[in-house]
Amino acid sequence: MKTFVAKPHEVTRDWFVIDAKGKVLGRVASEVARRLRGKHKPEFTPHVDTGDYIVIINAADIVVTGKKSQDKKYFRHTTYPGGIRETNFEKMQERFPGRAIQKAVKGMLPKGPLGYAMIKKLKVYAGAEHPHTAQQPKPLDL
């Protein structure tokens, strides 16, 4: 029996919606990264993007355990010399509610062109509304 290798044009992708209200950031991010990569499917192939589309709603209500809301640091650079800036999880959630989950998932995906294509299938929204109802996303419980 020959080993099955998925081809990009043969992959079928589903749409899933995840309600992140009250869920822990890392647990949601690891499951989302797994599904974006396609590891939950029997036809998973490492060099082909076999993952599904994921819509995350209520990203503003995601939580972290312990004192991570003050202790977890996010860094960015302004591209000027000495321009490193840092912020914590709490301030990041106030200013950009979906960015923390997006950065967490992006860090769990492979780096390179394949990983960049995978992260484009993640849609994050701070509130309960999303514009992807036409795709009829299935609810996913974590």
UniProtKB/Swiss-Prot annotation:
It holds the Pfam family Ribosomal_L13. The keyword Disulfide bond does not apply. GO terms for biological process: negative regulation of translation; translation. CDD domains: Ribosomal_L13. Keywords: Ribonucleoprotein, Ribosomal protein. One of its GO terms (molecular function) is structural constituent of ribosome. Coiled coil: none annotated. GO terms for cellular component: cytosolic large ribosomal subunit. InterPro entries: Ribosomal_uL13, Ribosomal_uL13_bac-type, Ribosomal_uL13_sf. Belongs to the universal ribosomal protein uL13 family. This protein is one of the early assembly proteins of the 50S ribosomal subunit, although it is not seen to bind rRNA by itself. It is important during the early stages of 50S assembly. Part of the 50S ribosomal subunit. This is Large ribosomal subunit protein uL13. It comes from Bordetella avium (strain 197N).
